[in-house]
Regions:
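Class I SAM-dependent methyltransferase Rossmann-like catalytic core
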Residues: 1-23
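A short acidic, often aromatic-flanked loop/helix-cap motif at beta-alpha or helix-coil junctions
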Residues: 10-11, 52-54, 66-69, 146-149, ...
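Conserved SAM-binding loop
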Residues: 24-124
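S-adenosyl-L-methionine-dependent methyltransferase catalytic module, highlighting the catalytic core
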Residues: 99-210
Length: 210
């Protein structure tokens, strides 16, 4: 289940997470940490594509978008048991199938912390660019009824005035949460028929403008 989710400043929760795993003495793995290994030295296990060689760190080289490369990590967990805790920070938004990565997190750890850019961040015009959010992000996320919901980055968000309405409620550029045992997740619109583009767009903004 999802515990203690918040909108916050980017990186605001990192000291709390480091203190948490230190106090609990949790065996922790950071998934996707190569770009920014902020969980070190409290976290001594990393899985990603770019090798990290920090002292005392055990590294699993894999491609988060290719399940055939996960065998070393999964074999380790099968032999040694699940990690107490996992960290996945600013990674889910980068992969084409976040459901696979979420499944990996629950397969290798009993609990964890996830941080992702918030919807407010993804609807901003960042760094002087003429488009909203980050071009390399495949989707964005929000909490709907305490469930992590994946939203497609439809092209029409660039010009629809309701995109600006979302920003009036800005509560922070990062969405973060702790979880235990499982991560409730769904994809916006799956299993729900829409009669028209207008219906789709109206439901999209109904869930996001707040």
């Amino acid at each position: 289940m999802i515990i203690d989710w918040n909108y916050n400043r980017i990186g605001e929760k990192r000291p709390d997470v480091k203190n948490f795993i230190l106090e609990k003495k949790y065996k922790t793995i950071d998934i996707g940490a190569s770009a920014m290994y902020w969980s070190y030295p409290e976290c001594k296990y990393v899985a990603d594509s770019v090798v990290i060689s920090n002292e005392g760190t055990t590294f699993f080289k894999l491609n988060l978008e290719d399940k055939s490369t996960w065998s070393e990590l999964l074999s380790y967990v099968e032999t040694n048991g699940k990690f107490d805790f996992s960290i996945c920070s600013h990674t889910l938004e980068d992969v084409f199938n976040p459901l696979d990565l979420i499944g990996l997190l629950t397969k290798i750890s009993n609990s964890g912390f996830i941080a992702i850019p918030s919807k407010y961040d993804e609807f901003l015009f960042l760094y002087g660019q003429p488009y909203r959010g980050n071009a390399h992000h495949k989707q964005f996320f929000d909490m709907v009824n305490d469930k992590l919901t994946i939203f497609p980055k439809f092209s029409w968000i660039e010009n629809d005035e309701r995109s600006n309405e979302i920003l009036k409620y800005d509560k922070g550029r990062e969405l973060s949460f702790y979880w235990e045992n499982e991560i409730p997740v769904e994809i916006f619109g799956v299993g729900k028929p829409f009669m028209s583009d207008g219906d789709l767009m109206n439901e999209y903004y109904k869930q996001l403008v707040k």
